[in-house]
Curated annotation (Swiss-Prot):
Catalytic activity from the UniProt record: 4-(trimethylamino)butanoate + ATP + CoA = 4-(trimethylamino)butanoyl-CoA + AMP + diphosphate; crotonobetaine + ATP + CoA = crotonobetainyl-CoA + AMP + diphosphate; (R)-carnitine + ATP + CoA = (R)-carnitinyl-CoA + AMP + diphosphate
Function as written in the Swiss-Prot or TrEMBL entry: Catalyzes the transfer of CoA to carnitine, generating the initial carnitinyl-CoA needed for the CaiB reaction cycle. Also has activity toward crotonobetaine and gamma-butyrobetaine.
SUPFAM superfamilies in alphabetical order: Acetyl-CoA synthetase-like
Stored Gene3D superfamilies: 3.30.300.30, N-terminal domain of ligase-like (3.40.50.12780)
Gene, per the UniProt record: caiC
One Pfam family linked to the record: AMP-binding
Taxonomic placement: Bacteria, Pseudomonadati, Pseudomonadota, Gammaproteobacteria, Enterobacterales
Species of the source: Escherichia coli O45:K1 (strain S88 / ExPEC)
GO biological process, one term: fatty acid metabolic process
Protein name: Crotonobetaine/carnitine--CoA ligase
Length: 517
């Protein structure tokens, strides 16, 4: 069954411009308070100009272009401009450092990068080291360094016509994006997302929160994340609603932004809720038009009740991951909600709890949460150039193993219990323990290392490192944290360090992590 009617992203934007014309499509607010607004017609024209820009730089169907950007209009222009010419977006987490960004460039085969001045020195060094296939960099800032292979994105875009110059044949099965996500291995994997995936995500997420064209969907989630793209942006655009993209989250500013833009839908993670709750109470806390707050794991019932009571909102729970594209289990529009359940399987999906032998379990029994979808349509297509990793999580008949533990009740409500894999959830970011351990293990004084997540009242989990030093060595906290800050993104840097004589292991030599909690 073709739910999206065979329409790829190029057709979507041409249709949206025709149908909604001068209606506001996108509002972007920068950290400095600068606001840019675009109608559906204007946004489609900016997307066309950006597509033409890429074409003039030699980008063709199937080429990969990396984006290392904070939330900004240019991210939206590039995302859909690339899709219009059949090229592939490779978003890079804006908080990653050189080593991590180099890995993504190398393993995505990106040949062009769009970024801003603050990240340019890092990529200049990457180019000098000849560590990737990058042949050109576009900077979105007005000031431009006098370096070869660097262009002004804005100047080039403004020179382009507002009609599309290059329109190769497209299929909904074509890849639109490769989104690298942390896993249980030491390196991130590239999740392949098709035009169909994104079109379906728009319709599905719009259904999930009963979105209409008179809604205003505001998000502070980073544009390089799947939730901003598929739960928010694609939902808003697919419904002809207004999408408000705020550059950075500020607990002090957030509620004022919700009120200023008359938002009817927004999304929150636990870190946001906790930081909002410590703001001074205001008589205007309930002065808003929010109908739903899309919510993602994990919050206590006490915290949930206090937040909903203070701000007069309801939380619509949604559970998913990059590989599922959308929140495949969640609360349904008009249906009852059963906190702390994560909801029931959404339309087009099946969900089961399975045991270690891949057999379905009855209600009430703990096991792995597994989801059935259609690869390349309702769930991701594959991991880029990694068939072994794909086969490990995705069965031939479309069953996806999430690696998460949970159970369901007799009415089909699912409950999330814990993450099976060694992942730490930190302020909305997934952090791989193995990745951090491999980096820290390169310190010359460290013999053994394990990192674990510990409960944090603000950011879900904090990161604690347990290390064993080489004989005769000493290591100060200052030296340790300085090393980490130089070798990994800030959000991955451990908050705590404990030096031990040894680490607890089982008979097979594996570290017993639960003994370190």
């Amino acid at each position: 069954m073709d739910i999206i009617g065979g329409q790829h992203l190029r057709q979507m934007w041409d249709d949206l411009a025709d149908v909604y014309g001068h209606k506001t499509a996108l509002i972007c607010e920068s950290s400095g308070g600068v606001v840019n607004r675009y109608s559906y017609l204007e946004l489609n024209q900016e997307i066309n100009r950006t597509a033409n820009l890429f074409y003039t730089l030699g980008i063709r169907k199937g080429d990969k272009v990396a984006l290392h950007l904070d939330n900004c209009p240019e991210f939206i222009f590039c995302w859909f401009g690339l899709a219009k010419i059949g090229a592939i977006m490779v978003p890079i987490n804006a908080r990653l450092l050189r080593e991590e960004s180099t890995w993504i460039l190398q393993n995505s085969q990106a040949c062009l990068l769009v970024t801003s001045a603050q990240f340019y020195p890092m990529y200049q060094q990457i180019q000098q080291e000849d560590a990737s296939q990058l042949r050109h960099i576009c900077l979105i800032d007005m000031a431009l360094p006098a370096d070869d292979g660097v262009s002004s994105f804005t100047q080039l875009k403004n020179q382009q016509p507002a009609t599309l110059c290059y329109a190769p044949p497209l299929s909904t099965d074509d890849t639109a994006e490769i989104l690298f996500t942390s896993g249980t291995t030491s390196r991130p994997k590239g999740v392949v997302i098709t035009h169909y995936n994104l079109r379906f995500a728009g319709y599905y997420s719009a259904w999930q929160c009963a979105l209409r064209d008179d809604d205003v969907y505001l998000t502070v989630m980073p544009a390089f994340h799947i939730d901003c793209q598929c739960t928010a942006a694609m939902a808003a655009f697919s419904a002809g609603a207004t999408f408000v993209l705020v550059e950075k989250y500020s607990a002090r500013a957030f509620w004022g932004q919700v009120q200023k833009y008359r938002a009817t839908i927004t999304e929150c993670i636990p870190m946001m809720i906790r930081t909002l709750m410590v703001q001074p109470p205001s008589a205007n806390d309930r002065q808003h038009r929010l109908r739903e707050v899309m919510f993602y794991l994990n919050l206590s019932e006490q915290e949930k009740d206090a937040f909903c009571e203070r701000f007069g909102v309801s939380l619509l729970t949604s559970y998913g991951m990059t590989e599922t594209i959308v929140g495949i289990i969640g609360d349904r529009p008009g249906d009852k909600r059963r906190w702390p359940s994560i909801g029931r399987a959404g339309f087009c999906y099946e969900a089961e709890i399975r045991d270690d032998h891949n057999r379905p379990l009855p209600a009430g029994e703990l096991g792995e949460i597994c989801i059935k979808g259609v690869p390349g349509k309702t769930i991701f297509k594959e991991y880029f150039l990694n068939p072994k990793a794909t086969a490990k999580v995705l069965e031939a008949d479309g069953w996806l193993h999430t690696g998460d533990t949970g159970y369901r009740d007799e009415e089909g409500f699912f409950y999330f219990v814990d993450r099976r894999c060694n992942m730490i959830k930190r302020g909305g970011e997934n952090v791989s323990c193995v990745e951090l351990e491999n980096i820290i293990a390169t310190h010359p004084k460290i013999q053994d290392i394990v990192v674990v997540g510990i409960k944090d009242s603000i950011r879900d989990e904090a990161i604690k490192a347990f290390v064993v030093l080489n004989e005769g060595e000493t290591l100060s906290e200052e030296e340790f944290f300085c090393f980490c800050e130089q070798n990994m993104a800030k959000f991955k840097v451990p908050s705590y360090l404990e030096i031990r004589k040894d680490l607890p292991r089982n008979c097979s030599g594996k570290i017993i992590r639960k003994n370190l909690k």
